[in-house]
Amino acid sequence: MNHYQVWTGGKNATHCQIAIPFICEAVDKFLSGNSRHGWVLPVSALKAQPWAKFRAIYPRWNLIADLSEMEERIFPGPNQPCILVSGKRLQFSEREIWRAPPGESILTDATWDHAKPRIQIAAPPPPFPEQASEPYGKGPRKFLKGAKIVPYSLVMIDEYPGDGRFTCVQSTTGYWREQQPMSGAQLSDNIHPVLAGENCLPFRIEGQRFAILPLSRENPRQLCVKEQGQQFQRYWKKAERAWKEYREIKQSNIPTLLENIEYRRGVSAQLPLRRRDAGRRVIYNSSGGRLLRAARTAKSPEAIINKDAYYYIARNQKEALYLVGVLNAPCLGDAIFQSKTSNLHFDLNPVKKIPIPAFRPKSKLHGRIAEISRQCEKLAQKTDLTGLRGQPNRTKAVQRALRESGLFDKLDAAVRKLLPNHAQKKP
């Protein structure tokens, strides 16, 4: 059906993605080889992984108009901006990259007339070779995606005070923005710490939230509502009713609230939570701008990893430090950025496309990276973040401290030896 070998919808997609093969077919049938053509596309088409093969066929796009500020969305979804582009078939070697001049930036809300004269066009750098890490990017012990503990207004708490009373977090997406956050009391046995990508700084975990979850008392690897006390049972029934009422996708086979939270065993796969695993567990943010932030969860031994984060249980603390050091190394910034699934998401790609060697205890280089990482971790923990609001500002403060101390230079020197084909050359 799809001889172009482009994406037509994932395994669990609710509909077939026909836009990509439709454009390919229309151009082949109705346009000559060098004809220009224009399309309204979701902005994700410029970077997202499902459009990768499509971009290989039509690699050059000229932006005609940014339609993201239109009051009526052209494509479904609460945040699906789109653009009007034109393009033509070109050879891979003719591709271009657009960037702002050094030291300048072009605001996302800038008009095209303002942005166009400031854009510098250049040939793209050669792509980094792609090869999955062993065992971090594939196999039974690879990095795993965190759970999907949503909606926040039903099951997530910012702070859990000592008096036992709580109010859930206000959701900010979809119909859940209209849902009044639930509140309750006396559920301390069912409230568990949670870490997400937003808690990751380089070499440091900052803050946490709490989730209301029915962890089984009889089987430490499962969730079970029926085993919980009456107070929890009443709360969960109320949450279940709200879940069905506000469920954004209206369909007959709506999963229960627990089934939604346990999507692909996101929570139970992490159970049982053991204190001994804390120093061996590595976590990094699955989405963000350009920067990957990795840290050990040493001070949060019983925290469940939530969405927007990937985690890995290392065999020992040295391996965990080694991984954190490699993932935070500034010299891998370009390779990690190039590996992204889309403009927003890293997903598993930093370890799926960059061949990080498996940790070898007897390797002097691996041991040196782990030791430098330990020093970075100590400095990151001591860095004063008082008065700094927002993750970007806190991240910059930690990076500045590591750079000024010379630790980043030492880390880069070691990682360049480890991954010479993926590290940026020293200026």
Predicted features, each with a name:
Residues 49-52, 206, 336-338, 381-382:
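Short, solvent-exposed loop/turn and secondary-structure capping segments
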Residues 1-180, 302-309, 315-316, 344-347:
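Signature of N6-adenine DNA methyltransferases within the class I
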Residues 59-60, 207, 342-345, 385-391:
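Juxtamembrane/interface motifs at transmembrane-helix termini
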Residues 20, 27, 125-371:
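Polybasic, glycine- and aromatic-enriched phosphate-binding surface used to engage nucleic acids
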Residues 355-427:
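Non-catalytic DNA-recognition/assembly elements of restriction-modification systems
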Residues 30, 34, 44-45, 58-66, ...:
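A generic secondary-structure signal for well-formed alpha-helical elements
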Residues 112, 246-249, 254-261, 385-388, ...:
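Extended hydrophobic/Leu-rich segments
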